[in-house]
């Protein structure tokens, strides 16, 4: 399901623990790390998609998390042409995402990367909130920067978080 501009509706999930560290999943059989994310199915709300993806990719159920907030609007990224299947190249541009910030209220042992028959991750870890942007695949960096920056105000209310290098407005690399 694509919108008129060629973007696939999608949700992204920033899951934090009590120390405000983020869940970082290692893509199966790859050396890249990312946040959980996935497409919104026809007839599904972004929140329903978020809970489905959270279970499929991380094995967590709604009772394991608390929603702290979400991005105000869609954040978009274009996928490089050489990553797009040939039959989709004339219509598909990339993803548009609503990002959710979730607090784990369950335990680390509730995480199960094999909850679905098609696992996305083969390892995971907790990382500092401001993940190094160079660790993010280049074409997703700006969206990660935008989502982490926008949602940080929900975690760091008492003192404005000093944005690390690379998170200051307009400094993320773009594809």
Swiss-Prot record:
Cofactors, names only: a divalent metal cation
Known function: Accelerates the degradation of transcripts by removing pyrophosphate from the 5'-end of triphosphorylated RNA, leading to a more labile monophosphorylated state that can stimulate subsequent ribonuclease cleavage.
UniProt xrefs under Pfam families: NUDIX
First-tier enzyme category under EC: hydrolase
Keyword Secreted attributed: no
Name of protein: RNA pyrophosphohydrolase
Record carries keyword Hydrolase: yes
One GO biological process term: mRNA catabolic process
Keywords for this protein: Hydrolase
Taxonomic superkingdom: Bacteria
Motif (Nudix box): 38-59
Gene Ontology MF term list: mRNA 5'-diphosphatase activity
Family: Belongs to the Nudix hydrolase family. RppH subfamily.
One of the record's GO cellular component terms: cytoplasm
Gene3D superfamilies: Nucleoside Triphosphate Pyrophosphohydrolase
Enzyme Commission identifier(s): 3.6.1.-
Domain Nudix hydrolase residues, every copy: 6-149
């Amino acid at each position: 399901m694509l919108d008129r501009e060629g973007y696939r509706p999608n949700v992204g999930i920033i899951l934090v623990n009590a120390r405000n560290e983020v869940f970082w999943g290692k893509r199966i059989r790859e050396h890249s790390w990312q946040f959980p994310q996935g497409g919104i199915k026809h007839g599904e709300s972004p929140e329903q998609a978020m809970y489905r993806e959270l279970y499929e990719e991380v094995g967590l159920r709604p009772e394991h998390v608390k929603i702290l907030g979400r991005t105000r609007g869609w954040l978009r990224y274009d996928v490089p042409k050489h990553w797009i299947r040939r039959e989709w190249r004339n219509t598909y541009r990339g993803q548009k995402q609503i990002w959710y910030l979730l607090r784990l209220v369950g335990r680390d042992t509730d995480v199960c990367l094999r909850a679905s028959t098609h696992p996305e991750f083969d390892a995971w870890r907790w990382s500092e909130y401001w993940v190094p942007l160079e660790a993010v695949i280049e074409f997703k960096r700006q969206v990660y920067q935008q989502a982490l920056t926008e949602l940080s105000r929900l975690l760091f209310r008492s003192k404005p978080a000093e944005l690390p290098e690379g998170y200051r407005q307009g400094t993320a690399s773009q594809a």
